[in-house]
């Protein structure tokens, strides 16, 4: 289940000499020992400091991997849920307006477990949405997406989804497990690679590797060779689907401005595959593109902005509003 292909332990120099430390994600991101009361209380202090500065949403990044126990998968352990509950309890006591958001890029059933019984996260990322919408629009077949959307039951009171299609990370494909056939996932990977995308893998227990995320701008992922305008419309259709679903939308900046693959990013000295969707814009250059009425950037930005205004002014899109999927 570990989301990376490189070694789990990283050699580190400490005041006591060389040590090997646990690094679930990368050597520059060392895991901490949450069994230590000092670690737990330090993070509660950090949490409260953020709240004192006006934080309204607290994002618990990759929280599923927080706790380690020998002989287990070290993911989704009971203690992880207890820590999330503790943070929720603290916030209910001192800052009940603050929202707890969990980020767990895992299959759907595992993902929504972080709602608990309405006593853990207020919101969870809707990780199945980005790959399902992409698959449906590229395939011209919405059945998998319709079946999944129709299966979304009622949530605990005060809970909702954070809907998105793109972010600073890649498009996670683990959430497709159980929703589309393995051969459909392989087809989707091929489609993304044909459009200039890059694939990140994870290591399996048998030493093999499986796709973990697709790195590409969502606009380029839906591009249509030979008919770029239709590709843009297909991209905007994907955003309309995301904006229409029950929950709260999370809109990625590069999507709003019609960003395309930043091929230079991964090739930089400090680059990684995800940088293809993290272009570092020059403000004057971007402003010129958005001011040019004939540019794709301006057209996408204008249509997208119009959709956002429409959504904001319609009470039917309140996170607590009921929703029915018609097929």
Question: Where in this protein do the model-derived segments appear?
Answer:
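Active-site and adjacent substrate-binding regions of carbohydrate-active enzymes
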Residues: 1-327
């Amino acid at each position: 289940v570990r989301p990376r292909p490189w070694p789990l332990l990283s050699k580190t120099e400490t005041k006591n000499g060389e040590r090997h430390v646990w690094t679930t994600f990368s050597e520059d991101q060392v895991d901490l020992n949450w069994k230590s009361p000092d670690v737990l209380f330090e993070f509660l202090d950090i949490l409260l400091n953020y709240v004192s500065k006006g934080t309204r949403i607290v994002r618990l990044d990759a929280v599923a991997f927080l706790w380690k126990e020998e002989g287990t998968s070290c993911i989704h352990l009971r203690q992880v849920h207890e820590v999330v509950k503790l943070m929720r309890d603290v916030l209910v006591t001192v800052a009940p307006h603050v929202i707890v958001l969990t980020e767990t890029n895992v299959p759907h059933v595992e993902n929504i477990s972080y709602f608990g019984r309405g006593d853990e996260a207020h919101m969870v990322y809707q990780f199945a949405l980005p790959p399902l919408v992409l698959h449906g629009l590229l395939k011209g077949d919405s059945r998998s997406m319709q079946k999944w959307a129709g299966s979304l039951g009622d949530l605990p009171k005060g809970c909702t989804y954070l809907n998105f299609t793109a972010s600073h990370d890649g498009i996670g494909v683990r959430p497709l497990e159980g929703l589309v056939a393995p051969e459909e996932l392989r087809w989707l990977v091929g489609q993304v690679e044909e459009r200039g995308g890059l694939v990140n893998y994870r290591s399996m227990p048998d030493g093999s590797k499986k796709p973990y995320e697709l790195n590409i701008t969502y606009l380029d992922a839906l591009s249509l060779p030979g008919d770029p305008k239709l590709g843009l419309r297909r991209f905007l259709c994907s955003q309309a689907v995301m904006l229409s679903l029950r929950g709260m939308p999370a809109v990625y900046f590069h999507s709003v401005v019609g960003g395309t693959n930043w091929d230079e990013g991964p090739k930089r000295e400090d680059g990684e595959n995800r940088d293809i969707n993290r272009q570092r814009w020059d403000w004057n250059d971007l402003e010129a593109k958005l001011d040019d009425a004939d540019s794709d950037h301006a057209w996408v930005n204008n249509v997208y902005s119009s959709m956002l205004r429409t959504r904001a002014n319609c009470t039917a899109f309140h996170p607590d509003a009921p929703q029915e999927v018609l097929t």
